[in-house]
């Protein structure tokens, strides 16, 4: 990313690939998801957006003491955390916000629809994957399964944004199994819903 950005600016960020459009955009690098007209020269199709249908049974609902949070704003929601299918063990892993500004927890599934909470030893009796320091409240979070890493101990990468008594802090950590993460490292300045991803075509984060 550019290093000369104004950290305090509220204006929209520039979009380089829109400001400097190439004459020809190569799309033979892999599968493409067409969400706009950027890569389309001409077409004869009519866009039609349909109303989403809400399933009567949610994938997750508050059940555990951590999620119920003593009745204050119960939460069991994926938020920005992430859901991954891990081919190593054939399991879907759903990372989610458990309890208002509290935990990051793990639920697993064989089909991607029916999830059960994976009890872990990070905090006995819970499915918490990361125990924050006392007084720290989690905000945005993101977990990424890196299937191209050359370091098995870094297959899972996690970002957390915390509200702390001393000020906001963002941290990253890595894990081999997606359940036990190493000591986190503090990042530079960023926002509460900061995210990250890996582009397998360009081989860049």
Walk through the language-model features, giving the residues of each:
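Carbohydrate-active catalytic/glycan-binding domains of CAZyme proteins
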Residues: 1-205
